[in-house]
Amino acid sequence: MINDMKIKFLEANCGDSIIISFVDDQGKIRNILIDGGTGETYSSKRRKGELYYVIEDICNKGQAIDLLILTHIDNDHIGGILKWFEEDKRFSSIVKNVWFNSGKLIAEYFKQPENP
């Protein structure tokens, strides 16, 4: 039973980026990140974006992103994630699981031709 849940929609310009945090049955805080918005959601030349600060906060608290969900590869959904992966080499130790909606991967899974 989840006792406490927070859902935050990050400032992502025209994109989407959502962080869901909750306390699981064992009292551990879990984090789910859905998409990463545009590249500027993580950082730009002039400033760090909201995604950057959310990730730093999670790391500083000794937590992880238990699940990263990438809904599709449009830049307004994946750009911030790509920027994060380029700039922060800790990502592989922070992200525990990834769900990626890829037509190619789904087609390979079902051994069907990819629908263009």
Q: Where in this protein do the model-derived segments appear?
A:
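Flexible, acidic/histidine-containing loops and adjacent segments that form or flank the divalent-metal
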Residues: 1-5, 82-116
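Active-site metal-binding motif and surrounding structural segment of the metallo-beta-lactamase
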Residues: 29, 47-98
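Active-site metal-binding loops of divalent metal-dependent hydrolases
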Residues: 35-39, 73, 103
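Conserved beta-strand hairpin/beta-sheet module of binuclear metal-dependent hydrolase folds
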Residues: 2-61
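Active-site environment of divalent metal-dependent phosphoester hydrolases
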Residues: 14, 73-79, 105-107
